[in-house]
């Protein structure tokens, strides 16, 4: 399948997953090529990430030339570190056969998730105060639930193991953020 058609089909599958429809999985290319092509989602979501980075950049960060570079480093590491950790984790969980499909789904789902993050972040900033904070907190809970939904669906795990995978992903994100902040 040509890349453009695969992107379109995969985005439709991601939209279905975004609506909590398990049928979205059938729109992904579950081959080795499909696995590697799913990382093109990082390029598609990049403009949204850049807008968010600019929205959340403080005046002090804006004055440093390393600010956007560190944001980009964090973004890139986020797309690489979790799949690498999952290579080990799916072995521990005895789910190696579902690894590629899981990463494919997580990668493509990132596009509607980044879209949601952009919209909710903008609304949260516009509303400000406690209402804005509640928007952001609600967003975080929803994103974690998306991770839970896809993890449980694709890896076919029980509740406890699914939560473990989601928490490991969250801890990796926090660790990467702390690492990047220490470099700035």
Predicted regions and their residues:
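Hydrophobic alpha-helical transmembrane segments in multi-pass membrane proteins
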Residues: 41-50, 79, 109, 113-117, ...
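Membrane-water interface at transmembrane helix exits
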Residues: 53-57, 86, 90-94, 116, ...
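Amphipathic alpha-helical interface surfaces
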Residues: 85, 98-99, 111, 115, ...
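Terminal transmembrane helical module of multi-pass membrane proteins
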Residues: 121-184
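Residue-level signal for the membrane-embedded core of alpha-helical transmembrane segments
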Residues: 76, 80, 84, 110, ...
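Cytoplasmic-side transmembrane-helix entry/capping segments in multi-pass membrane proteins
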Residues: 98-107, 160-164
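Selected alpha-helical membrane-embedding segments in polytopic membrane proteins
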Residues: 2-104
């Amino acid at each position: 399948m040509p890349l453009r058609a695969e992107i379109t089909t995969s985005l439709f599958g991601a939209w279905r997953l975004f609506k909590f429809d398990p049928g979205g999985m059938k729109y992904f290319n579950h081959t080795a090529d499909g696995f590697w092509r799913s990382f093109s989602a990082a390029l598609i979501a990049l403009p949204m990430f850049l807008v968010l980075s600019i929205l959340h950049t403080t005046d002090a960060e804006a004055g440093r030339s390393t600010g956007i570079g560190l944001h980009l480093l964090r973004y890139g590491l986020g797309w690489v570190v979790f799949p690498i950790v999952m290579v080990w984790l799916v072995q521990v969980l005895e789910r190696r056969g579902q690894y590629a499909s899981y990463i494919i789904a997580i990668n493509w789902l990132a596009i509607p998730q980044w879209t949601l993050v952009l919209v909710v972040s903008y609304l949260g900033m516009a509303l400000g105060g406690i209402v804005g904070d509640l928007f952001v907190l609600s967003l975080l809970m929803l994103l974690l639930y998306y991770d839970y939904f896809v993890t449980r669906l694709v890896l076919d795990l029980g509740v406890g193991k699914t939560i473990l995978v989601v928490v490991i992903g969250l801890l990796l994100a926090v660790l990467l953020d702390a690492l990047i902040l220490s470099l700035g």
